[in-house]
Structure formats: C-alpha cells, structure tokens
Amino acid sequence: MNDPLDSLSNDEFEIIETFDPETEDREDQWSIQQSIRIEPISIQMPNTLQSQRAPSPVGSKAPESLKDEDPDRTPEASIVETPLLTETLKEDRTPMSTPLASLVNSSQSPEFTLQNMSIVSESECSNNSSLVNVADVESTEIALRTSLLLVSELKSQLQAAKMSESTLLKSNSNHEIEENKKLSEKMEVMKNEFELKMQESAASVEKVIQEKDSAIEQLKVQLAQSQQVAELWKQGAEKNSNAQYSDSKTTIDRLLEENSKLRNLVDEEVARRLEESERRKLAEDQLKHARGGSVFDPPASFVASQLAERTTYSLNLEHELITLRKELEETKEALKKSVEESSNKDEIVSALHELAGPTGEHPHARFERAGDQQSEAEMSSTWSAGRLLELSRQIVHFISHQ
C-alpha cells in the first residue's frame, strides 16, 4: 500500500515512492516520471544567477527566426527543446551522477555546488548551441535543483516520522504486553480462587445431602415401626370394640326387657288398684243398703291416714320410675358414645401419636392398660344395670305385697 505522503507532485516533476510494509530494511525506491511543465516566468531565480545572465526568453514568444523556420509550430512548442535535455531525460533509470542519485544513497551525497549539480558541462556547449538554449537549460536546471532539495527535505522528515511512529508503536506494544500479562496473572488468581470456593461449596453441599439422607432413612425406619404398631393397635381395638358392642347390646336388650316387664307390672298394679277401688265402692253400697239406708261413716283420722299412706306410696313409686328411666337413658347414651368412639378414626390416629410419644412405654403394656380401663368401664355400666334391675324387683315385690 502506498503512503499518500510518498507521492509528491509539483509543477515540474511527479515523484513516486513504492513502499513495502513487510520489509523494514529496504532501499528507498524513487522513480521520476517525466511530467515537465516548465513556465520559467513563475520561477524565482537566485539573485546571483539573475545578475550574471540576461533574462531568459523562455516562456515568451519564440524569435522570428524560429517562426520563419517552422510555421507549423504549436503554442506548446514555445518552450525551446534542446537536444541535450531531451536525451538526458530519455536515458535509462540507472544510478546517476546527478544530485538525484545522491537521494538514493544519502550517506554518499556530495556537497552541492554549481559545478557538480549542473547537468550541462562546458564541453557540451558547442558552437551549434545558441544562447537561448543555454539559458533555457539553466532555468530548467535551477528548477530541478530546487525540486530535488525539497524532495530530500521531505524524505528526511518522512523518515523521522516513520522512526518516531515505529518507536511509539514498539513502546505501546510493550506496554500492552505488560498489561496483558498482569491481567492474565490476575485472571489466573481469580480463577484459582473461584475453583477453590466451588470445591468448598460442593463439599458442604455433599455433607448436607448425606445428613439429609441419613435423616430420611431414620424417618423411614420410624414410619415402618409406627405402621406396625398402628396395625397391632387397630386389631386390638377392633376386637375390643366388637366385644364391647356385643356386651353393651346384650345389656341394653336385658334392660329393655326388664323395663317392659316393670311397665307391665305397673299397669297390672294400677288395674288391680282400680278394680279394688271399684269393689270397695260396690261393698260400701251393699253395706249401705243392708243397714237400711244408713250411711257408713268411718272415722276421719283413719281415712286421712290411709290417704296419706297411699299418696306417699304413689309418690315414691313415681320417683323410682323416673329414676329408672333416667338411668336407662344415661346407659343408652354411654353405649352410643362407646360405639362412636370405637368407630372414630381420628382417635386411632391420636392413639398412634400417644404410642410414639416420649414416655417409652411398650405398646403391649399400653394396650393392656387401655383394656383394663375399658373392662372397668364395662363393669361399672354392668353394676349400674344390675342395680337398676334389683331396684325394679324390689318395687315389684313391694307393690305385690301391698
């Protein structure tokens, strides 16, 4: 790629430098392309040279002698073309002895003087060359020397800029390499720390998982034991509930039968009392007719005592009947409650929790204790039923004697 600064153009020459970035130790390759546009009027000659020669007619109209010799001459041909300059520019681009060759190898550049910078020697100025041609060549020579001086200065500036740029790039690259090295070391340290933390967290998580697994195993064992205990308790509860239900049903049936018997006895006693009162009334009427219409008048104290005794007896009998009915209802409620408790699943679950409690009591012992309590309750209910039956019998016996 060509650097835009490597291509310089002025009004006389176009100087091109080919740059290859892959080769640092290269020789500057300069090429001069012939693009001569000389206008000597615009060239400022040095004061010393202007005082030594006459004004050059280059750029003005050609002499009349030249016009007469070539009538077909174009306006561009007003610049006098000397054979010497033309042949010099048409030579092959080989190392020259002119100041252009000194730019290629700056270490061997001689001191610039008017003698060694001139491209026209004294021998080349023959009698055939006119003064006009010599002045034209000198003006061209001055312009060329000025351009070469500018090119050499630009070349030195360009080389200095390239050297400074390469130095800056090297320093920047070294700084970036150091920063990248520090950053990589820092990243390596962070990576090691992160790996260490990950290993520690993995170890802690593994430990927690093992603890939870052991706790789950213990819970499974406890659950299996609780299921076995619950099954045993359920079997015992079913047996006890069936036995209690059968016993309670038998007791209730017996009590109902006794109650029906007592009611029949009471009805019979009431009917007998009514029949006796009817017979007494009939006997009193018969006795009254037998005495000739006289009324039998028993003593009032006797009648009052008999009425008081009969009233007390009736009240006692009624009180006993009410008491028996209440006890019978209570027995029915107790039986109903025991049946409901035996069929309630929530009580089974609560019993399971009690069995798994911190008391440490063996399940069979708890079953035996529960069975003892249930047997005591059965005995209490049986004793109450027997007491009621005994009282009923006493009442019947008392009524029959009366």
Swiss-Prot record:
Q: How is it modified after translation?
A: Phosphorylation on Thr-74 by ikke-1 is required for allophagic function.
Which organism was this protein described from? Caenorhabditis elegans
Listed A to Z, the keywords are: Autophagy, Coiled coil, Cytoplasm, Phosphoprotein
Give the sites modified to Phosphothreonine.
Answer: 74
Its signal peptide is none
User: What protein name does the entry list?
Assistant: Allophagy receptor allo-1
On assembly, the entry states: Self-associates. Interacts (via N-terminus) with ikke-1; the interaction is direct. Interacts (via the LIR motif) with lgg-1. Interacts (via C-terminus) with ubiquitinated proteins.
Gene Ontology molecular function: protein homodimerization activity
Q: Which chain positions lie within coiled-coil regions?
A: 168-347
